[in-house]
């Protein structure tokens, strides 16, 4: 407040003259005495925040703009108009709500809020809820202006924990309008740019348009958009990308200057913006409206004050908003994932026709670029093949069992009813949200790593829910496209969390295998779950010994090449090649362990790149040796039984090298091709199989080593985010004449300001962003070199694999009771190859059963 000027009868006067008119206004400066009052101008109608009316312009208050310049600081003047009303002049210097790096594009930070009005509003149930008109420039772009959900944006300052949202009397627009919610879609984001956000948001809006186009549906139709709510949860106000904020402003969802830091002495935990938008913006920053088939979409934008990780974002979705909307189906999408045009409908249909389905997921596709240009990168091609075969073999098999080990958080759906805890607060969501508290210091290392894959815990808790009989389903008709890592460092970092989380979560599900018997599943389903547990246990053991198994295959094949009747190399050349490769192999394994113990992949990008190249060359040599040994074995068998066709066939069958290799190859690569044809999606076989084969040794020797050597890394990067900011303003209440608590807030209400702000947001999207240069801070650099030593797990893993290798290849007498070297090598190689064949056969049979079930049950 300005101080009193005692030289003028103690009347409240500013100690300095008010700033000049803006350049577009013209005229003289405004001395305080020239202010005129007009109480007859009606205030703009607010959106009703409750049936009894809660937010309004007080009829005794007179709104007057304070003309400010760009360099002013926050201050205010209150004058009495002589009629019991007040005139408050506010001079506020406002900053963009979003933070983020300065070199990622210009957000509307220029001081366009020359006109701000102090508005006296009643608190809604003790909460700050504001309704503000959207810019008229925005309304010119859209068709419908008949209801306040289209013409006003609603802001709510949440000051509670997500679990207390309903108890603190917060309401959403859908509650006030009496609408039922069939689909509740959440988009979680951190600092993704406008391209990634628009890719996802535009895809979601296309799906809503498709739902409205289904005229013969009993659920959907032209007004189907009223049954869909899209919730955008951004993890941290200072983390959100400013250009993404510009997109939301251009869609009418977000307005700068509305948010506050503290309400009634309580820090704001989330800023909630609600608007029914009629505009969609694609990844090329093209605006699309009704003329492009865009239907209205109810948007709920939750901007969290602090960065508290993704699982906390899901708490806001499930615990804060879910109980108010009580949706039927919840869809989870990560910003950056583009859902197919009808994918959300197909996911919803799974729940509609199968009443026992608790969760479902679609296919995750790798984005390959225009004309598949990204497939030229072997790293992208190998991941494309991996994703495809997982969606053709693994997910269908698990869907047949009824338990999908993980529904990917990037694109999945859950039945809201199935997620609910029991009356004692125990259930799937309780176990799921425990992950929010599982920092390294708060839990043992096993539990902390397990909750790196909290979605796996949720999946198991759903199917094992006490007294229920829920199953999980894979929907092959639904898909979401996402970017995959295209650099070695990014790839290794991503897989570290995936591998560690899935490894420990897999152990959790097997340790708690008996929980399914307390569910309401029938005996047949429980037996199927037990079989799946055994299948997963076998795979888990295989993954534990994967590095030893691959080394043994390399060792046996490269030493056996010299013992065939017609070796490919001159005398001793094969032995020299084997010795060189063997020493390099062991040396690189040791180097990797040393690097992984104290460094991030970003610090040793070229070292990892050269290691991957070496393993690709090694794989090529192993394949050559395998092919040569097999061909020579066939020749020998044929020559042994030249004149008898039956004898030739029997000789081939008895030829160990031929039989085992052929069975293993047929059970993998031929099954890959056949199953892909059955799913009408074989193209990845031709474009990505070869890169996958040559990258497979790196999956085993590089990813596993880095993951196991970093089991201590369970941080989420949110430490220290405990302060309360006040840059947005503080709201305090006073009692009004009717005894109801009221607050005074300064808001941008003039259309001139709203339009200028809106134009700036749109103009910002037309300016190409400056390429972002990633920099490491001092703390990260220090953590790269100083990581604690995780002795027990890594030591056990290394020793167990060394024992396995030693037993097979060592020729000392101590191992003779296992048989001589050739016998041990032959038996073990046969075991490995037949195990691969058996696991592949199970996956293939599961894939076929899934297709049959899809035909008859949908």
UniProtKB/Swiss-Prot annotation:
Membrane topology per record: Multi-pass membrane protein
EC number: 2.4.1.16
Transmembrane portions of the chain: 537-557, 576-596, 609-629, 661-680, 685-707, 791-811, 831-851
Record's subcellular location: Cell membrane
BP-aspect Gene Ontology terms: cell wall organization; chitin biosynthetic process
GO annotations of cellular component type: cell septum; plasma membrane
Catalytic activity: [(1->4)-N-acetyl-beta-D-glucosaminyl](n) + UDP-N-acetyl-alpha-D-glucosamine = [(1->4)-N-acetyl-beta-D-glucosaminyl](n+1) + UDP + H(+)
Region entry Disordered, spans: 1-63
Main location: membrane
Assigned keywords, A-Z: Cell membrane, Cell wall biogenesis/degradation, Glycosyltransferase, Membrane, Transferase, Transmembrane, Transmembrane helix
Domain of life the protein comes from: Eukaryota
InterPro entries in the cross-refs: Chitin_synth (IPR004835), Chitin_synth_fun (IPR004834), Chitin_synth_N (IPR013616), Glyco_trans_2-like (IPR001173), Nucleotide-diphossugar_trans (IPR029044)
UniProt feature, compositional bias: Low complexity: 1-15
EC class name: transferase
MF-aspect GO terms: chitin synthase activity
Family: Belongs to the chitin synthase family.
Role this protein plays: Polymerizes chitin, a structural polymer of the cell wall and septum, by transferring the sugar moiety of UDP-GlcNAc to the non-reducing end of the growing chitin polymer.
Protein name per the record: Chitin synthase 1
Native source species: Rhizopus oligosporus
Top-level taxonomy: Eukaryota, Fungi, Fungi incertae sedis, Mucoromycota, Mucoromycotina
Gene designation per UniProt: CHS1
């Amino acid at each position: 407040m300005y101080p009193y000027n005692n030289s003028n009868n103690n009347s409240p006067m500013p100690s300095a003259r008010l700033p000049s008119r803006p350049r577009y206004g013209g005229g003289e400066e405004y001395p305080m005495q020239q202010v005129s009052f007009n109480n007859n101008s009606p205030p703009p109608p607010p959106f009703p925040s409750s049936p009894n009316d809660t937010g309004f312009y007080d009829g005794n208050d007179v709104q007057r703009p304070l003309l400010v310049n760009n360099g002013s600081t926050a201050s205010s003047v209150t004058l009495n108009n002589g009629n019991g009303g007040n005139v408050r002049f506010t001079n506020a210097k406002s900053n963009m709500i979003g933070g983020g790096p300065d070199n990622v594009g210009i957000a509307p930070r220029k001081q366009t809020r020359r006109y701000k009005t102090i508005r006296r509003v009643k608190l809604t149930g003790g909460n700050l809820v504001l309704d503000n008109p959207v810019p008229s420039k925005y309304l010119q772009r859209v068709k419908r202006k008949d209801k306040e959900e289209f013409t006003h944006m609603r802001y709510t300052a949440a000051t509670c924990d997500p679990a207390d949202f309903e108890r603190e009397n917060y309401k959403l627009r859908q509650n006030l309008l009496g609408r039922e919610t069939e689909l509740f879609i959440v988009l979680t984001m951190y600092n993704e740019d406008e391209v990634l956000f628009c890719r996802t948001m535009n895809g979601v809006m296309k799906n809503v348009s498709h739902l409205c186009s289904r005229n013969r549906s009993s659920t959907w139709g032209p007004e189907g958009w009223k049954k869909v709510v899209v919730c955008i949860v951004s993890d941290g106000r200072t983390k959100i990308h400013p250009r993404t904020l510009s997109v939301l402003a251009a869609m009418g969802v977000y307005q700068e200057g509305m948010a506050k830091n503290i309400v009634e002495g309580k820090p704001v935990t989330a800023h909630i913006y609600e608007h029914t938008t009629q505009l969609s913006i694609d990844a090329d920053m093209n605006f699309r409206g009704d003329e492009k088939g865009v239907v209205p979409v109810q948007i709920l934008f939750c901007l969290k004050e602090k960065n508290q990780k993704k699982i906390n974002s899901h708490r806001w979705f499930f615990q804060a908003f879910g109980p108010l909307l009580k949706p039927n189906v919840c869809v989870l999408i990560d910003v950056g994932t583009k859902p197919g045009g009808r994918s959300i409908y197909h996911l919803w249909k799974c729940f509609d026709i199968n009443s026992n389905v608790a969760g479902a997921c679609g296919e995750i596709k790798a984005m390959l670029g225009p004309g598949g240009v990204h497939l030229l990168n072997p790293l992208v091609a190998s991941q494309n093949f991996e994703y495809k075969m997982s969606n053709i073999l693994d997910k269908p098999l698990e869907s047949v069992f009824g338990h999908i080990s993980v529904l990917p958080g990037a694109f999945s759906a859950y039945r809201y009813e199935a997620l609910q805890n029991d009356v004692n607060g125990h259930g799937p969501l309780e176990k799921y949200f425990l992950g929010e508290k599982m920092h390294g210091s708060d839990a043992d290392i096993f539990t902390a790593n397990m909750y790196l894959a909290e979605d796996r815990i949720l999946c198991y808790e759903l199917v094992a829910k006490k007294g229920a009989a829920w199953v999980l389903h894979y929907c092959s008709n639904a898909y979401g496209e996402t970017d995959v890592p295209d650099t070695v460092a990014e790839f290794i970092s991503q897989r570290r969390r995936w591998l560690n989380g899935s490894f420990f979560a897999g152990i959790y599900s097997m340790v708690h295998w008996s929980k399914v018997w307390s569910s309401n599943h029938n005996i047949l389903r429980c037996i199927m779950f037990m079989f799946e547990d055994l299948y997963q246990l076998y795979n888990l053991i295989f993954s534990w010994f994967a590095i030893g198994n691959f080394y043994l295959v390399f060792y046996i094949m490269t030493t056996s090449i010299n013992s065939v009747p017609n070796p490919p190399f001159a005398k001793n050349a094969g032995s020299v090649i084997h010795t060189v490769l063997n020493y390099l192999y062991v040396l690189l394994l040791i180097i990797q362990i040393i690097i992984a113990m104290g460094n991030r992949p970003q610090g040793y990008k070229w070292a990892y790149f050269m290691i991957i190249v070496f393993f690709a060359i090694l794989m090529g040599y192993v394949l050559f040796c395998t092919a040569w040994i097999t061909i020579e074995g066939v020749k020998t068998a044929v020559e042994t039984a030249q004149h008898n066709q039956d004898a030739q066939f029997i000789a081939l069958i008895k030829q160990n090298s031929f039989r085992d290799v052929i069975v293993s190859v047929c059970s993998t690569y031929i099954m890959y091709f056949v199953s892909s044809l059955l799913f009408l999606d074989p193209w990845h076989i031709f474009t990505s199989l070869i890169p996958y084969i040559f990258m497979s040794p790196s999956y085993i020797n590089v990813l596993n080593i880095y993951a196991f050597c970093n089991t201590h890394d369970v941080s989420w990067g949110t430490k220290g985010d405990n302060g309360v900011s006040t840059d947005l303003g503080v709201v305090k209440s006073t009692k009004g004449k009717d005894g109801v608590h009221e607050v005074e807030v300064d808001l941008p209400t003039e259309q001139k300001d709203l339009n200028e702000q809106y134009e700036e947001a749109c103009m910002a999207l037309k300016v190409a962003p400056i390429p972002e240069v990633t920099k490491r801070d001092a703390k990260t650099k220090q953590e790269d070199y100083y990581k604690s030593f995780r002795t027990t797990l890594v030591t056990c893993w290394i020793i167990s694999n060394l024992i396995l290798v030693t037993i097979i290849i060592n020729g000392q007498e101590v191992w003779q009771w296992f048989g001589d070297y050739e016998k041990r090598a032959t038996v073990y190689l046969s075991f490995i190859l037949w195990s691969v064949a058996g696991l592949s056969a199970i996956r293939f049979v599961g894939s076929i059963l899934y297709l049959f079930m899809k035909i008859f049950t949908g």
